[in-house]
Amino acid sequence: MSIREWFEDRRKITGLLKNSVERDSKDVNEMERNKNLSIDYVKINRLWVQCDNCESLLYIRFLRENKSVCEECGYYLQMNSSDRIELLIDRGTRHPMDEDMYTLDVLQFHSENEPAHSDPLHSEDESYKDHITFCQIETGLTDAIQTGIGQLNGLPIALGVMDFKFMGGSMGSVVGEKITRLIERATEESLPVIMVCASGGARMQEGSFSSMQMAKIASALYIPQKDNRLLYVSILTSPTTGGVTASFGMLGDIIIAEPKAYIAFAGKIVIDQTLGQKVIEDFQVTEHLFGHGLFDLIVPRNLLKCVLSELFYVLQSSS
């Protein structure tokens, strides 16, 4: 090999290396750009929410100030239990109850030997225990309800608030026990009970243990209500369905519903298939049900605290 040929070979190798380095640099830069875009998307996702009805982008800070009601179309977005408590309870007056109570997988729903999945919410095979753990991490709650004692415009009350973000607000053993204890304490201390319902119904992973909570809560309410020792106000939000609707959701001395809330026992598709005929649209929406006498009041979210305090003052003065 001559010296000229050797230099030509070195030039070719150098050119190939240079092209390879340039391609690698472009790939790295592209990855960095995609990473930045991903970070920006996460930041944006924490600052903005899209309305489920009109698809408008809503700034979270303003949305919370507006009680999670869309500024564009007036649609009621879901509120978590902590925001509901902040809406109703005077600041600094709340004393939570049974925060350390958590669910046990008594039925061992799905074997622990089955393969795990990365996203429990999108896997029907995920164990119940893993699903509960996932929801606890996501929401910061031990189960689908928060209970406690507090003051509403200076009036002491007992409050239970269900959280739909925790397994669809489903009612299991812990939810039933916490509600029962809240009712018993309210009866002992002569406090009115407010229950904010947001649930898909009984929790299927607990089988009959879940269904039993319907009877247990109804029994806890029956005697105090019959003897006029307990005022129970049920607030139905969207969605309230299944076993919750069939039990304590509809047992209130006063039943209040939010505007345009979805309230039902069985879903529309199930009813269509069972009856073999089409049912009318929006027959499970607040306004239609109110027209047929299922509720006492429809109260906008921003007026709820004032309306409740007025009701309690009137009832206390008349008793």
Curated annotation (Swiss-Prot):
Binds 1 zinc ion per subunit. One of its GO terms (molecular function) is ATP binding. Gene3D superfamilies: 2-enoyl-CoA Hydratase, Chain A, domain 1. It catalyses: N(6)-carboxybiotinyl-L-lysyl-[protein] + acetyl-CoA = N(6)-biotinyl-L-lysyl-[protein] + malonyl-CoA. GO terms for cellular component: acetyl-CoA carboxylase complex; chloroplast stroma. Keywords: ATP-binding, Chloroplast, Fatty acid biosynthesis, Fatty acid metabolism, Lipid biosynthesis, Lipid metabolism, Metal-binding, Nucleotide-binding, Plastid, Transferase, Zinc, Zinc-finger. It is found in: Plastid, Chloroplast stroma. It holds the Pfam family Carboxyl_trans. Its EC number is 2.1.3.15. Pathway: Lipid metabolism; malonyl-CoA biosynthesis; malonyl-CoA from acetyl-CoA: step 1/1. HAMAP family: AcetylCoA_CT_beta. Belongs to the AccD/PCCB family. Component of the acetyl coenzyme A carboxylase (ACC) complex. Biotin carboxylase (BC) catalyzes the carboxylation of biotin on its carrier protein (BCCP) and then the CO(2) group is transferred by the transcarboxylase to acetyl-CoA to form malonyl-CoA. This is Acetyl-coenzyme A carboxylase carboxyl transferase subunit beta, chloroplastic.
